[in-house]
Amino acid sequence: MINSNQMSRSHLPEVQKPRGPQTNWSEHAKALESSSSVTKFLSSNVLYALESQKPRDMAARSIAFPSVNVHTLAHPQISKAWRALSSLSVNNTYLRPGVTPPIDVGTNDSYSARERSTAKVISSTGGSVYSSTRPNLSAMNVSGTGRSFHSFPSSVPGDDKIVAEKFPRGNNEIRESEPSCTHLNGVEKSFGNSAFPAEQFESRKACLDDMDDDDILENIDVDQIVMEHYHSTSTPQPSVSNFSLRTPPVDRSASRLEEECNLPPELCSNCSHGIKLGLCPEASTHVEQMKDVLLAISNELLDDATDLSPDRVGQLRQERLRLKKQIQQLENHIRDKESQKSQFLSSTATRIFQYETPKSTNYKMDQPQTDFRAHVSDQGRYACDSWNTPRDSSFSVDRYGLSSAPVEREQYVPKIIDVTYTEGSNDKKWSSREFPWTRKLEVNNKKVFGNHSFRPNQREIINATMSGSDVFVLMPTGGGKSLTYQLPALICGGITLVISPLVSLIQDQIMNLLQANIPAASLSAGMEWAEQLKIFQELNSEHSKYKLLYVTPEKVAKSDSLLRHLENLNSRGLLARFVIDEAHCVSQWGHDFRPDYQSLGILKQKFPNIPVLALTATATASVKEDVVQALGLVNCVVFRQSFNRPNLWYSVVPKTKKCLEDIDKFIKENHFDECGIIYCLSRMDCEKVSERLQEFGHKAAFYHGSMEPEQRAFIQTQWSKDEINIICATVAFGMGINKPDVRFVIHHSLPKSIEGYHQECGRAGRDGQRSSCVLYYGYGDYIRVKHMISQGGVDQSPMATGYNRVASSGRLLETNTENLLRMVRYCENEVECRRFLQLVHLGEKFDSTNCKKTCDNCCSSQSLIDKDVTLITRQLVELVKQTGERFSSAHILEVYRGSLNQMVKKHRHETLQFHGAGKHLSKIEVSRILHYLVTEDILVEDVRKSDMYGSVSSLLQVNNAKATILFSGSQTIVMKFPSSVKVLKPSKQGATAAKGPLTSEKQSTLPLTTEDAPPKDVNLSANMYTALRKLRTALVKEAPDGVMAYHIFINSTLQQISRRIPRTKEELLEINGLGKAKVSKYGDQLLETIETTVNEYYGTNKKDSIISNDSPDSGKRRRDENISPNVAEDDDFEVSPSQSCKKTVRNKSNEVLHGECIDGDRRGMELDFDFKDEDGSEIRPEGRVLPW
């Protein structure tokens, strides 16, 4: 039998895991030989191994101790049993059922001579003192087992302090204190390890004298107690209540009244359901409705500001401010209720009983008799002399020595502010060159970054942020956003903090900066603490070497240590500015909303005098306002730039069964051995497309979210280093891409929305060179995507997370379906300019004449006419009703055109009124009209999956509300169709790409701005470009991990070198993209490669006669003398289409494997020889040009 002291010890963690006791049956038998000791032994230490060995009264009982309801036992019985257990003096050293230690005849004498320790717990809550007495286990060894026990105090309630003290065994003093009780369903139960007042002790002693061992054993299951002790010594367990728990009754009316009284004034108004807004169960729906109203008010203020009266503007602003406050209060209220609910659920057991989890305890244990010392600091973290724990890690420790989760700081709640916007794009003061830093900007832009001019709005943005203004920037992908904060960070003192959403983006930016010798560092959650500590120490130094510090939004939201270091930097005047990259992630209405981004408003709250620069490439007016509010930018200068990407060529191609053959043909004829992305709908599609392209001879790989992170990183690295050319990916391959020389983006399947399509196409041509965006469209993909949307299986915004995702599923499905239908309308539109369709959707006005035939519709030579199809649409709607709304659009099409196939005859649809009514129309025309009815929501497609085969099908149904309007005669439907009169095509360059796969002739519709140059110099430039690419590949292999090819030289830089043929380092500095740091690192290798290539081309014996390199001045004079009058104008040369096509066949046999360049690069380089500077202006021949 086990005494109470040993029971209490079972709930404490052990410092050293004990070994199991040895079998000692021989000692057991030896003890039983003496008849005098049998009785004593049986009454104290025997555990019966077999049922037959138990006394009669015990053998009949079940091993499991039956649970006793608290209401079935009288309180005196409970107290009597507990007092008996608490005062037992018999010691039991059993550690495993059926095994006992050797019997020491002199146990009682030696035991009484040992020291006993008393644990005194001083409670901070009740002020009472509890103490208990037990053996000093640190000095006690159980003979025969080799086990030793360290001294630990008994487990008692209390949060403040436990101190282990020693008292001699002979000291029987009991301190006066209040007994410790736990309240459970109205029953008070005293803890067994508590000391009692002396007067109570005497009564207990008298009670125990009246009880013998048999009475105790009849009421106690020794087997069960020993089993619990055995399990508890292996793993610390929380104490379990023996009584079933009940939830006390709650007065709901009183609770509701209290909640109503605590509501803020904004939530006390009644909603549409007639109850207070804060108490409505549909509060989340009201939030969305109020956001819609707020969006409408904001759009009215933005779009109709000039037409509104001052009173109306004032009313709208007041209403907008009221709605903002109401939305904020309601969202906070919903969040608080959800948090309370989640905390309640996490603290509620799933069974009918529940573990009683003790409160977290910050304690300190001092035990001089042991070598190991564990301390818990005031912050609740373990601290040991040999441990080096991070300061950011905050843990609480419970009574069992287990650390809980990190303690989160209070969530930041943004404040409603009144924002004053200033349009900066047309403000001439920001473009002024009178600022004191203008000279430094221009010098460092050329010297460090290798740029000879600024791109549009770059200078203006830099001037605004360096003037101390908060700036919001809308700039398209590839517009040069990074320079707007990297250049100011270089010339200004202090640290620029950059918040970027992905670690891969951060690493890419840092690699670029290190190549330019600009010191930068990053902090992320995945870094080792030693690395973070080193960075923090550098930030704290008097002269920190870092200019930029990159962090993720999660780091700002959760790291108190980072905020402390920022405060330190600010106090020393070394905090320059905050930069928020991908700022649209702040907005709940943005397509990439991330909750941690909303916590970034704390930066402006803590550091109001530090300017903020927010950058994004995708933001509507509502998203912009939401971002500015969340970040707390009171006086905000806004810079806008067109989303139009002139270097991208858009096309929509019909998707056929030979789609993969068409893709192979397009790549080989237009972008052979160039880098590209193919976006697919599913993982299976990615693998299938990749495998097929490999069979066609392309260096391709697949990438999707189901791959292991290491495997995905390896594939992306291979692609970034040009070891593979084509990556077939789902949209999981997204924001982390910063490769500038992506020449094509192909969509193998239909995108989910126009926003997503525009963003994915934006990954092509970031270097400003001509690139292709091709979408293969089939209506079957629409059915697949719609089904996956309805099942929640498709999310083409991989980072679209946050609590807005828990909004009404019906509303979310409706929004996603509408976005998908807009994408279908975009694909089905064969008339309007592709750029116009995209930019209008994004809220930008665009003149289609500026497209300059860089999309398939503008290149089309078809003559189109308008046709009234109202009667046809009515017939089709009526036909859907007649078929019972249970058939697909394909079946309706067959019936309408008069088909007599098996399906039509099976359902007797040949007898319907409108069977054959459209036999004069082609399948394409009827299909277009049906799709139009679906996109206009007159017909609705019910997409479902077959249970038998798993295939996806859609059934057409009628939207009665819209159909009523159509049949009323108030709606006329007009569509454009090709004219029956064919017009003569002006040239092959005008061929349309909307009717079939693109070919080299169709691709040649891209504008050619320069005349052809003499063939021999084209060949020299092509040879030079190939040699330079091989040099770049070698440099990448020698560079550290993480350095990509475009970090060293981008393709446009290599093309400029190939065209100009610089022969000195001074001439290399004239190349756009080559700064002083890169010329110092790679200049000698570049010049050596150039020299070798020129010698091979002209021959070593002609070197002195053709090209003289005596001095830079003589080279310049010869260059000026040998340039013909037309060379300066025609320096941006490129090869003719016929010439490049002839080389395509030869290129297929000249491929070099293992990352080497191929002769096919000549053709790719020639097609891109319409060079332009980064600011859009043509590059003039400032370098060396060879004579003909």
Swiss-Prot record:
Subcellular location field: Nucleus; Chromosome
CDD domains linked to this entry: DEXHc_RecQ (cd17920), SF2_C_RecQ (cd18794)
Tissue/organ expression: Expressed in roots, seedlings, young leaves, shoots, shoot apical mersitem, inflorescences, flowers, siliques and seeds.
Coiled-coil boundaries: 311-346
Enzyme class, UniProt record, top EC level: isomerase
Keywords: ATP-binding, Chromosome, Coiled coil, DNA damage, DNA recombination, DNA repair, DNA-binding, Helicase, Hydrolase, Isomerase, Magnesium, Manganese, Metal-binding, Nucleotide-binding, Nucleus
Residue ranges occupied by any Helicase C-terminal domain in the UniProt entry: 662-807
Gene3D superfamilies: HRDC domain, P-loop containing nucleotide triphosphate hydrolases, Winged helix-like DNA-binding domain superfamily/Winged helix DNA-binding domain
SMART domains in UniProt: DEXDc (SM00487), HELICc (SM00490), RQC (SM00956)
EC assignment: 5.6.2.4
Description of what induces expression: By cold. Repressed by abscisic acid (ABA).
GO annotations of cellular component type: chromosome; nucleus; plasmodesma
Superkingdom to which the source organism belongs: Eukaryota
UniProt catalytic activity: Couples ATP hydrolysis with the unwinding of duplex DNA by translocating in the 3'-5' direction; ATP + H2O = ADP + phosphate + H(+)
Phenotype upon loss of function: Enhanced sensitivity to genotoxic stress such as UV light, methyl methanesulfonate (MMS) and mitomycin C (MMC), and hyperrecombination (HR) during cell division.
Basic and acidic residues composition-biased segments: 1113-1122, 1177-1188
Residue ranges of domain HRDC in the record: 1018-1100
Positions of the Helicase ATP-binding domain: 462-637
Cofactor: Mg(2+); Mn(2+)
Annotated stretches, region: Disordered: 1-25, 988-1015, 1102-1147, 1168-1188
SUPFAM superfamilies linked to this entry: HRDC-like, P-loop containing nucleoside triphosphate hydrolases
Chain's role: DNA helicase involved in DNA repair. Probably unwinds DNA in the 3'-5' direction. Required for the maintenance of genome stability by modulation of the DNA damage response and repression of crossovers. Confers resistance to genotoxic stress. Suppresses spontaneous homologous recombination (HR) events in somatic cells together with its partners RMI1 and TOP3A. Contributes to the maintenance of chromosome integrity during meiosis. Involved in the removal of telomeric bridges that appear to arise during meiotic recombination. Required to resolve or dissolve MSH4-dependent telomeric associations.
Name of the protein this chain belongs to: ATP-dependent DNA helicase Q-like 4A
The organism of origin for this protein: Arabidopsis thaliana
Lineage: Eukaryota, Viridiplantae, Streptophyta, Embryophyta, Tracheophyta
